[in-house]
């Protein structure tokens, strides 16, 4: 800690063994909005029907690998034989071979290039409408409950998109528009500002509204006046999902393919298969993101 924080002045320090999947824990923790707790998911073997294992072949790697081996054996031996999985790895794993049956396949990838594969999948999914629109449209807990969903996301939350702005890339908050802070939530003494979303009628609302919000937003808003800026101009904003799509489009599918060594047709086929199972598809990479870009790889997988 002293070497990293005092010598280099970085806050990017975390106390955990790299061999145990530190980049995966931190990357997924960032995606889930909890860097201190570093939450991360495990495959729901009972309810899933398709598994994508990136650098973490079940029964051979991953965490906990012994339990995953047992879970894989159970899923693979179901009478209905509906569980399918793909193992992404530079090396042929034992969990994806002729001896393991015909309900799986191995996808070879260049070492350390998994991020390019995942971003290629994300680009194809967003370009072809292969995403869970109902889930992604719920901006907060109230909307989630009203829609009968199990979770909500920040896909609809608006981001400041003005080059040179001190908060370029940050979320737009209610205070930016002059909205009053909401009362503290139950069990807390501190009020937390809301995020801003656009509703179907084009109006702006807090993310706590009990209704879905728009996924694809690119517009301008007028910030609240302040002593430092008594006459603010229009501020360009974008929704988070719109921003993700634009970032994914910075490279073509062919460029992603060249980077990771997986043909573009294979990336498309994998993305199509992954999205054909709806909420019954899972992705896991615990221990499989140990590279220089591991944090970003884990973050992309979690998205």
Model-inferred region functions:
Residues 17-19, 37-97, 106, 246:
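A conserved hydrophobic secondary-structure block that centers on an alpha-helix together
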Residues 268, 272-303:
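Acidic catalytic cores of enzymes that act on phosphate-bearing nucleotides/polynucleotides
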Residues 1-47:
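Anionic-ligand anchoring segments at beta-strand to alpha-helix junctions in alpha/beta enzyme folds, i.e.
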Residues 56-57, 90-93, 111-112, 272, ...:
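An acidic- and aromatic-residue-enriched active-site/binding cleft used to recognize and process polar
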Residues 1, 20-24, 59-62, 92-97, ...:
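Flexible loop/turn segments at secondary-structure boundaries
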Residues 79, 86, 96-277:
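Long, well-ordered, tryptophan-enriched scaffold segments
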């Amino acid at each position: 800690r002293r070497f990293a924080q005092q010598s280099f002045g970085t806050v990017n320090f975390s106390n955990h063994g790299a061999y145990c999947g530190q980049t995966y824990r931190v990357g997924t923790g960032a995606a889930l909005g909890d860097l201190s707790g570093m939450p991360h998911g495990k495959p729901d073997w009972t309810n899933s029907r398709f598994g994508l294992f990136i650098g973490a072949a079940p029964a051979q790697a991953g965490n906990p690998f012994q339990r995953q081996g047992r879970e894989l054996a159970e899923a693979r031996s179901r009478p209905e034989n509906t569980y399918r999985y793909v193992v992404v790895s530079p090396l042929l794993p034992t969990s994806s071979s002729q001896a393991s049956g015909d309900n799986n396949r191995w996808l070879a990838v260049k070492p350390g290039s998994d991020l390019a594969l995942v971003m290629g999948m994300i680009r194809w999914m967003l370009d072809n409408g292969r995403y869970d629109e109902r889930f992604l449209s719920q901006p907060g807990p109230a909307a989630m409950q009203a829609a009968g969903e199990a979770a909500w996301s920040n896909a609809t939350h608006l981001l400041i998109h003005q080059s040179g702005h001190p908060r370029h890339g940050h979320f737009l908050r209610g205070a930016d528009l002059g909205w009053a802070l909401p009362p503290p939530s139950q069990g807390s003494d501190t009020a937390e500002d809301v995020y801003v979303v656009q509703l179907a009628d084009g109006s702006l609302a807090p993310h706590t509204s009990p209704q879905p919000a728009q996924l694809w937003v690119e517009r301008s808003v007028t910030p609240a006046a302040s002593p430092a800026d008594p006459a603010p101009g229009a501020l360009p904003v974008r929704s988070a999902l719109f921003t993700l799509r634009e970032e994914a489009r910075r490279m073509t599918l062919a460029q992603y393919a060249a980077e990771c060594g997986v043909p573009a047709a294979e990336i498309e086929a994998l993305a199509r298969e992954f999205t054909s199972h709806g909420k019954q598809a899972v992705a896991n990479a615990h221990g499989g993101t140990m590279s220089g870009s591991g944090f970003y790889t884990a973050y992309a997988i979690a998205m």
